[in-house]
Structures are given as C-alpha cells and as structure tokens.
Amino acid sequence: MRKTILLPVMWVTALPLGDIASPPLVAATNEPFALARRQMVAEQLSGPGRNITNAGVLAAMGRVPRHEFVPKPLRSMAYQDRPLPIGNGQTISQPYIVAFMTEQLEPKPTDRVLEVGTGSGYQAAVLAEMTAEVYTMEIIEELAQRAAADLKRLGYTNVHVRAGDGYRGWAEAAPFDAVIVTCAPEHVPQPLVDQLKEGGRMVIPIGRIWNQELVLLRKRGGKLEQHAVLPVSFVPMTGQAQEQPEGRSPKAAGTPKPEPGRMQR
C-alpha cells in the first residue's frame, strides 16, 4: 500500500504509553515553542560536550517543530534531550540521536532518501528540510497513518509515507542516494543494499538487542565499505528481518571496533 503524504554504549528505549524542498511555514519565530527549540540546538546539539557541527543539520533541527510529533500531554517535554513515548510501544528519538544519525548520513539538497522506521515522522521531517525527497516506511500501520497526516498538516510535501515492512525497502522508488534505518536487524537487509545507489550512504544499527553497533556503509564498486561508529541499542527490526537465517549479511570491507559511547533513542 503506497500512501504519498496522505498520509542510538547510546541506549535506545521503547517506553510504554514512540527538486529541493522549501521549508514549511511551521517554524515561525513567534510560535510558542521557538525559544525551546533554539535552546535545544544551542545546548543539546552544539553546546559543550556535544559534537554536532553540520550547519545544515543544526538549521533543520532548529526549524522542525518536535512538539508537533509527540502526544499533546507530553508537549511540555518535547525539547528535552530524551526519547518520549508515541504509542504502540514506540518512541520518538531524543533530539541528539536524530541529529547524530542525520549528520552521519551527510544528506545533500538533491538526495532522495529512504527511511526505515517512520515512527512519529520527526526524523523524516528533519530529512525533508535538507533533501529533495524522503520515502519513509513504517511497519505499524497506525503510526504510518498518523505520521503521514502530521507531515501533510505541517507542509512537508516532499515526504512520502508507506505502511509496510521496511526490510524490503521501496523498490519502485529506488535507487536512493541515502538510507537511514531506525530499528536494528541482525544483518544489513539485502534489498536495502540493492536499492542504494553507487556511492550512496547508509546509516543503520546492526545486531541483537544489547549487542548492537551503529554502522555507516558506503557503496563503492558494488561493494559495501563498512565503518562501525559506536555501540548502540535500538528496538529490533520486525517483519521479514526476524525470519532470516543467522549470519546472512552483505559482504562489507573494513569493520573496525567501535569506540565506547552512549546514546538514547
């Protein structure tokens, strides 16, 4: 079912109750959460002890209204550096992990990006501020429908939402310049590799729960160059990912040990 805008030890937790686009008109300087959003960027992303330096990422995070992607009772906490529940056992990632993964992806204004794990739609909105087209997949249909409605309401016309199993990717919209995955399979899904352009980038958490690495992949000469960024813990990828034999993963070159780190989703 295709719906076009109808619709990160870093520890990740699931809490109970998760052509170039013009910026939407939702980030007016006089809207009530604008100050909180500016403080989030200055203190949580680029402040002391933080390492987000990509100006495009910081600008996008300063425009996207995170409070619009969390349940109304939690909006007062929307700009705290923490994950928040969004229903269906899922969370919206803490702002820092969104910024970190986006920076690792190196998005460009002409990119067409695939996101696996729409969740609230917040990550897709950040990517939409920086790229030409975002195709995002969510296996929980209720979340996909809600995210699509919110993204449409906020003016993100370059985001396309599909309810379905992200393990398979979005073949008819491929190839993609970049792929970002916000749930953890035990290996890199081959369909996502096949749908990645030559020279394309992928950011994905890989491994079993409590033993995962955030990995940056680049496709060169039909092969994957792999760099482990740091240990993470994300919610497992469900669907077809859970049906795959152990050890199946596309061949990758270079798998250095990651440095220790911590993060939440």
Model-derived features: where do they sit?
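Positively charged n-region of N-terminal signal peptides that target proteins for export
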Residues: 1-4
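Conserved nucleotide-cofactor-binding alpha/beta core module
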Residues: 106-224
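Bacterial N-terminal signal peptides
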Residues: 7-19
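Active-site capping/gating segments
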Residues: 207-252, 260-265
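Class I SAM-dependent transferase core
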Residues: 24-114, 125, 130, 145, ...
